[in-house]
Amino acid sequence: PAHRRFFDPAHYRIIVTDQRGAGRSKPLGDLTDNTTDHLVADMEALRERLGLDSWFLFGGSWGSSLALAYAIAHPERCRGLILRGIFLCRRPEVDWFMTGMRRVFPEAWRRFSEYLPEAERHDLLTNYHRRLIDPDPDIHLPAAKIWAQYEGACSTLLPSADAASSFADPAKSLGLARIEAHYFVNDLFMPEEHLLNGVERFRHMPGVIVQGRYDMVCPLVSADALSRAWPEADYVIVPDA
């Protein structure tokens, strides 16, 4: 519902999807054949199944990444892109998530890092990933909860009990944390600059980039880089978000 409300159902046919292993997709947290290319192929299969010649794509954070990847692969099927909270799948963005946000949210990061034994804190991603893919729920569920709570604590400009509680949901936390760690350790299954280098494939189509200036999970520097590579797109910075 949160995503549907951006659009008037009297004017648009709204299609909302949950990617492999996340949300209502089953099995939850499954990593089998779970790569960026598989997700792009799933989107294309869905378009064909619904009998759509083309569609607009709307996505935020990782959703912005996936929309860009799809537009690079299938520009002829896109009418336009509406993107918010840009994530370009580059190593500095992953490093920022894992360690950089401690500069703004040190207390949240301490809870995140200190969940691991001291000897494992030199490589948070590797050691969280190892726990998150462990088949034992007594190992992967607590790690997923801590990961999701960290992201939730850093995801809003002002503290939000509602946001924190939504990230603490066990089902959401496992789908979120396990899949994020899986993609992070595999470099998001794409070359470092793939999304920026692919702008030429879709720069002719309408585009809107919306970015909160104080987005901590997806810092503004990524939206700025995309806007510079794609100056034809409308670029809106929300000053107090």
Where on the chain are the PLM-derived regions?
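Short glycine-enriched nucleophile-adjacent loop
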Residues: S64-P75, L81
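A catalytic-pocket lid/entrance helix-loop region that shapes and gates access to the active site
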Residues: E76-Y128
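Conserved alpha/beta-hydrolase "acid-adjacent" motif
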Residues: P191, M216-S222
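Catalytic histidine neighborhood in serine/cysteine hydrolases
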Residues: L220-D240
